[in-house]
Regions:
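Juxtamembrane and boundary regions of transmembrane helices in multi-pass small-molecule transporters
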Residues: 1-3, 41-68, 140, 200-203, ...
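Short, strongly hydrophobic alpha-helical membrane anchors
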Residues: 1-39
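Interfacial loop-to-helix junctions that mark the boundaries of transmembrane helices
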Residues: 30-42, 78-86, 107-123, 238-248, ...
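Hydrophobic mid-bilayer segments of alpha-helices in multi-pass membrane transport proteins
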Residues: 43-64, 84-102, 118-132, 183, ...
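Low-complexity, highly charged intrinsically disordered N-terminal segments
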Residues: 79-148, 152-160
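Transmembrane helical segments that form the transport core of multi-pass membrane transport proteins
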Residues: 103-115, 138, 142, 289-393
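Helix-loop-helix module between adjacent transmembrane segments
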Residues: 130-135, 155-156, 167-179, 211-220, ...
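Hydrophobic transmembrane alpha-helices that form the pore/transport pathway of multi-pass ion
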Residues: 153, 159-215, 229, 385-403, ...
Length: 462
């Protein structure tokens, strides 16, 4: 297997991951922007944020409206533009920019606000998505998952599904959640979403994928954004995460996946085994790709540096194009734009989120289920960051906040930073018939694995 030829690079990964762990324990204030605007602007921003969320639920209606107009007409193109999920928050962020300028009677105020934000996460997701989607990395991930799948005495279409969505989701604890999401989405698209599966199975699978990736990053303290926001301040290390969160994530991922497999056994078992042979990639090239990926992950909070590494990586890809597939640059840019819009709008939501978290009557139960629900309408990393600002919060509330944030991370596209990457890859698959991913369908598909996560993260052995 190709990955066995890359021992040198693989042996170097633990050191790089240790570097990442040290880098990632910076205070949350270093990686989240501070809101300089107060008062009426915040309320208008919340109203626009609500409109943006509503927009994500009606993109399919805009797509239908586009078909009512002549092809190439202004209205047809306008409605197609509004139907693109990845640009929703970017559109409303632009409206917010103009609104700030008007309300402050100064374009400079709007410019200062944008320049005061921290767009490191969108940049990182863009870069890591492109690197993780390259042929050498995808082939390696597929080889590992296939190895695990063949340990199960089941047809490959069933065993690969189990291995990918249970054990594969845990990759996010080591290579970061965006990278794991990208790899799994690409593999699932080719093996399942483009193979004529029903829409019901498609939504059950994407819901399972989003939830499992969200909780699957909790085995370590440096890979899941909502954990990263609090780990440094609260002194949480990898042992703390593995012993309090990680084992629950493993159990929940496995049980949720087995539940979906049982519900769709007949359909999964009837699929044709993927006969596509991996295009050969030299071991040394796979090793170099892993080295670049690990370096980018280790430098996740230094965008100027990891972008330089990314430029070098693009040079490597160009020089070895005979072993490469087309880069996912457009997809990465769209996902980065989505997250940048979310950062722009989400940074002005502290005025209503923080009081909810800091409420003196807050109990562990309220915090857990409140965080799970709130995560559906706001990025879970922003939620845990705001919680880290509350002084004197008890250990029970700390656990409840983070556990709730990761539990609800699969309910919507905006709930967890890696979700737009998965949605961007899967929405063009045959399973969705060119209509994109329905937010309602995603929500319904994510509810069963979310309930399973609730069982393990809140009710089991606490």
């Amino acid at each position: 297997m190709n990955f066995l030829l890359s021992d040198l690079s693989l042996n170097a990964l633990p050191t790089l991951w240790l570097t990442l762990a040290e880098t990632a324990t910076k205070t949350a204030a270093d990686v989240v922007s501070v809101n300089p605007l107060k008062g009426p602007v915040e309320y208008v921003a919340t109203f626009l944020f609500a409109l943006a969320i509503l927009h994500t639920f009606v993109v399919k209606q805009f797509a239908k409206l586009a078909h009512k107009y002549p092809e190439g007409s202004i209205m047809e193109n306008l409605f197609h533009f509004l139907a693109e999920t990845e640009i929703v928050f970017g559109i409303w962020a632009a409206v917010l920019f103009l609104t700030i300028g008007v309300m402050k009677l100064s374009v400079q105020s709007a410019v200062d606000y944008i320049e005061g934000l921290n767009f490191t996460e969108p940049k990182f997701v863009l870069v890591v998505m492109v690197v993780a989607a390259t042929r050498p990395v995808v082939n390696l991930a597929e080889t590992i998952i296939l190895f695990l799948a063949r340990l199960l005495p089941l047809k490959e279409t069933v065993s690969f599904y189990i291995a990918a969505l249970s054990f594969g989701a845990l990759f996010g604890s080591f290579i970061t959640e965006p990278a794991a999401m990208t790899l799994l989405a690409l593999l699932l698209k080719r093996r399942y979403f483009d193979q004529g599966i029903s829409k019901t199975l498609a939504y059950a699978t994407i819901g399972l994928l989003f939830v499992n990736v969200s909780i699957g990053g909790t085995l370590t303290h440096f890979a899941a954004p909502p954990v990263l926001m609090v780990a440094g301040k609260w002194g949480w290390g990898t042992w703390h995460m593995a012993s309090n969160f990680g084992w629950r994530a493993v159990a929940s991922c496995l049980c949720s996946t087995l539940l979906v497999v049982l519900c769709f056994w007949k359909q999964l078992n009837s699929l044709e085994v993927d006969k596509t042979e991996q295009q050969k990639v030299p071991g040394w090239l796979t090793g170099l790709h892993l080295m670049f990926l690990a370096t980018i992950v280790a430098l996740a909070h230094h965008p100027d540096v990891f972008f330089g590494v990314f430029m070098m990586f693009l040079g490597l890809v160009t020089a070895t194009k005979e072993y490469q597939d087309p880069l996912k640059l457009k997809e990465g840019l769209l996902v980065g734009f989505f997250l940048a819009g979310l950062v722009t709008m989400g940074s002005l939501q502290e005025h209503w989120l923080r009081p909810l978290i800091a409420n003196e009557s807050m109990t562990g139960l309220k915090m857990y289920f409140g965080a799970t629900a709130l995560t559906a309408i706001t990025d879970n990393a922003a939620l845990t960051y705001l919680g880290s600002l509350v002084e004197g919060i008890s250990d029970q509330l700390k656990y409840a906040l983070v556990a709730g944030a990761v539990t609800g991370g699969g309910l919507t596209v905006i709930a967890n930073a890696p979700n737009p990457a998965g949605a961007g890859i899967l929405q063009s698959s045959k399973a969705f018939e060119g209509t994109g991913i329905s937010p309602v369908g995603l929500l319904l598909g994510a509810i069963p694995p979310t309930l399973m996560a609730i069982v393990f993260f809140w009710f089991v052995a606490r």
